[in-house]
A protein has these predicted regions:
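Terminal presequence/propeptide segments associated with secretion/organelle targeting
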Residues: 1-266
């Protein structure tokens, strides 16, 4: 809870020891009497979307194919970052914000999986789906409209689960993992032929310089090697990026050597 201070006239003011707590014209009353059906309710915040109404197969996919891969990959990356941050104040300062941002959704995924398990959400969803199926079966028109809903949902989620897991591993390891990939994608986005020298200078100033301000190449080299390794272990061979063929052939599958060579030539 934050207390907002204002000037003597109850208007915004610079700091002064004479400032007083702001007095609003209206306040939202808080009742301790509980609530009744049809009482007014509101959500504080701005949720852009919700997964509250996911079916049981959707919840299962979120747990197994989204959260678990994210927890694993970010855990590996953050452990590498943390070791370097503990060993160097310079690295700690550079990576403090990055670490906090990465661990935020990492903790979210861990907490979500624990909560879904503790509350037996999948079992509850299945009970709701069974009740829905029973309701549909009681009426011919309902069967005509909704008869295939659950089958289609099950088929849609189960048939896409493997690809969702692959997508999560690749995205977490490369788009959100090794920072050098982000740098490469940033540079690729520049339309060199269609840009003036001044526009390129502005791009370099606004993006590239700020990137290197809080970047440690030797640390990112370790992350790249670790990300390459975990993807190779978790993603089926037929779904691996083509670069893995080069690494296997030229570097004998040694991702640390590959990463060292990449950074040596970058």
């Amino acid at each position: 809870v934050f207390r907002v201070y204002a000037g003597a006239d109850n208007k915004p003011a610079a700091y002064s020891k004479d400032n007083k707590p702001y007095q609003p014209k209206y306040v939202a009353e808080v009742s301790l009497q509980g609530y009744q059906d049809k009482d007014y309710a509101m959500t504080i915040g701005f949720p852009g979307s919700t997964d509250r109404y996911l079916c049981s197969w959707g919840v299962q996919q979120r747990i197994e194919d989204s959260n678990k891969p994210r927890i694993e990959v970010r855990g590996i990356k953050q452990a590498i970052w943390k070791d370097a941050m503990l060993a160097s104040d310079e690295v700690r300062i550079k990576y403090a914000s990055k670490y906090a941002g990465s661990s935020n959704y990492w903790k979210n995924s861990i907490g979500m999986n624990k909560g879904l398990a503790n509350l037996k959400v999948i079992d509850r969803k299945r009970q709701e789906e069974a009740a829905f199926a029973s309701w549909v079966a009681q009426d011919a028109k309902r069967k005509e409209v909704y008869g295939d809903v659950l089958n289609l949902l099950e088929k849609g989620y189960t048939s896409s689960s493997e690809y969702k897991k692959i997508s999560t591993y690749l995205g977490e390891a490369f788009l959100s993992g090794a920072e050098i990939v982000k740098l490469a994608r940033m540079i690729q986005s520049v339309d060199v032929k269609g840009s003036t020298p001044e526009e390129i200078d502005i791009f370099l100033e606004d993006n590239i310089k700020s990137f290197f301000k809080d970047y440690d190449a030797s640390l990112d080299r370790k992350v790249l090697a670790a990300m390459m390794k975990i993807v190779k272990e978790r993603v089926p061979a037929e779904n691996l990026p083509d670069i893995y063929k080069t690494v296997d052939k030229k570097y004998k599958g040694d991702y640390e050597k590959y990463a060292a060579d990449v950074f040596k030539k970058t």
